Amino acid sequence: MIIAIDGPAASGKGTLAKRLAAHYGFRHLDTGVIYRAVAKAMLDAGADLTDEARAAEVARTLDPSRFDDPALKSHAVGEAASVVSAHPQVRAALVEFQKTFAAAPPGAVLDGRDIGTVICPDAEVKIFVVASPEVRAHRRFLEAQSRGEPADEAVILSDIVKRDERDKNRSAAPLKQAPDAVLLDNSYLDIEGGVRAAIDIVEAVRAGRRRV
């Protein structure tokens, strides 16, 4: 079984994906980490983020061991990832990696922006997770504080709104809800409530009550 979870930045999709994977014994891939790794490599090299050819070359030679780098979680890397992920050549370079991961048994949970629409359009379960920009900004603010990083919630909110626009309007795999995805509004659910709601969606499919 493949579970595709999509949604905007800081919507809570990553946490839900990890918990679902643990619950069902499936493998988990946060596809955003892949793009963050490309972005950080570009930043570390002092490269122009708008240089599509350079970014695509980085993507093709990406070292998976970089995926665990705590620095990938920084706000700056996240903003840079939004830029490099808009490059069609970068996305093309990383599509096969994601599809291969999804196809491996016994099952997989992938979260990102285009899992249900591009990477795994035939996924048995598709969930589109949303939350208000204000709630998402506050979550990112708290995350930054927990890491001891300076943060301005108003700036984070502004960046999130801008990132949403970039993600929705990019030419390559724009952020959008798949027609057969279930919408899960995570604005005012705690972690356990969100996980229960997601499990209910998956169980409905497993029981054959609903084709998602």
Curated annotation (Swiss-Prot):
GO terms for biological process: pyrimidine nucleotide metabolic process. Pfam families: Cytidylate_kin. Keywords: ATP-binding, Cytoplasm, Kinase, Nucleotide-binding, Transferase. The keyword ATP-binding applies. It catalyses: CMP + ATP = CDP + ADP; dCMP + ATP = dCDP + ADP. GO terms for molecular function: ATP binding; CMP kinase activity; dCMP kinase activity. SUPFAM superfamilies: P-loop containing nucleoside triphosphate hydrolases. It is an enzyme of class 2 (transferase). ATP binds at G7, P8, A9, A10, S11, G12, K13, G14, T15. It is found in: Cytoplasm. GO terms for cellular component: cytoplasm. Its EC number is 2.7.4.25. It comes from the Bacteria. Its main location: cytoplasm. NCBIfam families: cmk. HAMAP family: Cytidyl_kinase_type1. Belongs to the cytidylate kinase family. Type 1 subfamily. This is Cytidylate kinase.
